[in-house]
C-alpha cells in the first residue's frame, strides 16, 4: 500500500524496487541539482516504491534527497519509507573506516537527510580497505544500531566472493560483530554477469542476512544504447561486446537498457530489492513499465526477451559473460 507505515527493522518489507542516489553523483550527471528529484520521489512513492539508497560518496545526493524528502514530509511522513545510506568512502581513492569517522558520518547523514535515524547503513566498498579496519568500522555500526541511531547495517561492494566471505565471517563468534542485516551487491546480477545468483543462498543461510540488494543493473552504463562511460573499469573487449549488444538490440527494435532492466528484475524479483538509478521522470516511468511487464508475465521474461538474452549472452558476450574487473586490495585473510 502507498503511504503505509513501515517497520524499520523489517527489511523484508522493502519494496521490490528502490530509488537509487548514485545518479546524483557528478560521475553520472553534470548538474545533479537539475534533476527533478522531488517529482521523481513523489511519483515513485505513489507507485509502490518505499525506499531510497544514497551515500555521502555520491556528491550532493544526501543533501538533495534530504531537501526533497523534507519538502514532501506532509504527503509522505518519515515513517512511510526506508532511508538507506553508506559510510566510509569519501572519494575515488579516499576511505576512512575509523570508528570516530563512522560515527560522525552517520550523524552527518541524519542531518543531511532531516531524520533522527537511518533505516540501513552500509559500510561502503569494503574491498578497498584492510580487514582490521573493516572490523572496527562494523563494530561501530553495531554500537550505533544498539543505540537506535541506525536500525540495520551491512556492507556493500563489488567482488561478490569477498563480500560473501566477509558477511559469513561476521556471523561467527570470532568476529565479535554478529550477523549483518544486509548486503548491497553491484554489477553482479545483470545481462552481462549473474554471479550473484550463486551466492544468494550462502548470504542468507550462512551469513544470516535479512536482505540482499542488487544494484547497478545496467552495470554502471555498460548495458545501454549510449556509449559506456569513460570511468568504467571493464576491459576493452567487454566494452566492445556491450556495444555489439546495443547494436543487436537496435536491429531487433529493442532498447538494450530496457532489456537489461527486465532481465535483472526477472532474475531478482522475490529474492531481494533492485536499486534503480533514474535521472528523469521519463526514466522512472520506463523502469516502472519494465517492472510491470515482467510482473504481468509471472515475474518471467517474455519468450522474445528470453531469446534475445540467450543470444546476447551466448553469442555476443561469449567468454566475456561473467567477466569481472579488478576492484579493491588483496585480502589474504579470505580462505
Swiss-Prot record:
Active site: 58
First-tier enzyme category under EC: oxidoreductase
Any one GO molecular-function label of the UniProt entry: D-arabinose 1-dehydrogenase [NAD(P)+] activity
Annotated site residue numbers, Lowers pKa of active site Tyr: 86
EC id: 1.1.1.116
The organism's place on the tree of life at top rank: Eukaryota
Example of a GO biological process term: dehydro-D-arabinono-1,4-lactone biosynthetic process
Catalytic activity: D-arabinose + NAD(+) = D-arabinono-1,4-lactone + NADH + H(+)
Similarity section: Belongs to the aldo/keto reductase family. Aldo/keto reductase 2 subfamily.
Annotated protein name in UniProt: D-arabinose 1-dehydrogenase
Organism this protein belongs to: Saccharomyces cerevisiae (strain ATCC 204508 / S288c) (Baker's yeast)
Gene from which the chain derives: ARA2
